[in-house]
Amino acid sequence: MAAGGPAAGSAAPISSTSSLPLAALNMRVRRRLSLFLNVRTQVAADWTALAEEMDFEYLEIRQLETHADPTGRLLDAWQGRPGASVGRLLELLTKLGRDDVLLELGPSIEEDCQKYILKQQQEEAEKPLQVAAVDSSVPRTAELAGITTLDDPLGHMPERFDAFICYCPSDIQFVQEMIRQLEQTNYRLKLCVSDRDVLPGTCVWSIASELIEKRCRRMVVVVSDDYLQSKECDFQTKFALSLSPGAHQKRLIPIKYKAMKKEFPSILRFITVCDYTNPCTKSWFWTRLAKALSLP
């Protein structure tokens, strides 16, 4: 089989979308790719073979092996390299003989590519007309620069997440448990944790607004006594609520993970709470939270 395209009868994206950046593929497609490629077998090429075709070195591959989702990490790392594109990914999968992946995910990849093209066209149409000399003098904003560890420094491919985690530093241990339960298991969710994912040097209010509104599908609020004293958490919560009045979009999910001496915040009382302190429902806690964060 030629390495230039999928096998006959496969449902891979058409050539007009093959030059699109890897950022066109959403989390659903990436998770399904991981299901195919994370499994180590003797009969089919796995993610390590794909990494070698992408010119990753031995030590880089060994480092990727330490992650719960090595395929996802591989795609994140590769998409910032020269030549990375949807079309190139399909060529490599074909070269490795993974026609099963192309047949299964082809329609979904095509759909993602078409959505990406449509979004780019809409954004282009909405741009105001400006004189080039004036436009070039406008300083770049934080939204256009790299603000997270996996961002494109120029802002062309912003990193996106399933949920922004609003928390106080004193509650970081529970946040770390959340990472283990939601990112490093079969749920494979992608959380935005400021202390881990956000680069220093930019206004915290600007970063929070950008991430909550444009980069994260939902926001999880870790409620505690210390949370009630945090101006930063107060801003993040009120900002998220302003984006979804009445919680109609199920955008904000409060979590109570330990007993509180102070009264539960009134602005969150009308939203269903995930209560980690209730022993009767604790066994269902992570499943309920994961499903809530996975909703479209």
UniProtKB/Swiss-Prot annotation:
The keyword Cytoplasm applies. Disulfide bonds: none annotated. The modification Phosphoserine is found at S244. Ubiquitinated; undergoes 'Lys-63'-linked polyubiquitination. OTUD4 specifically hydrolyzes 'Lys-63'-linked polyubiquitinated MYD88. Deubiquitinated by USP3 that cleaves 'Lys-63'-linked ubiquitin chains leading to inhibition of MYD88-induced NF-kappa-B signaling. The intermediate domain (ID) is required for the phosphorylation and activation of IRAK. Adapter protein involved in the Toll-like receptor and IL-1 receptor signaling pathway in the innate immune response. Acts via IRAK1, IRAK2, IRF7 and TRAF6, leading to NF-kappa-B activation, cytokine secretion and the inflammatory response. Increases IL-8 transcription. Involved in IL-18-mediated signaling pathway. Activates IRF1 resulting in its rapid migration into the nucleus to mediate an efficient induction of IFN-beta, NOS2/INOS, and IL12A genes. This is Myeloid differentiation primary response protein MyD88. It comes from Pan troglodytes. The lineage of its organism: Eukaryota, Metazoa, Chordata, Craniata, Vertebrata. The gene is MYD88.
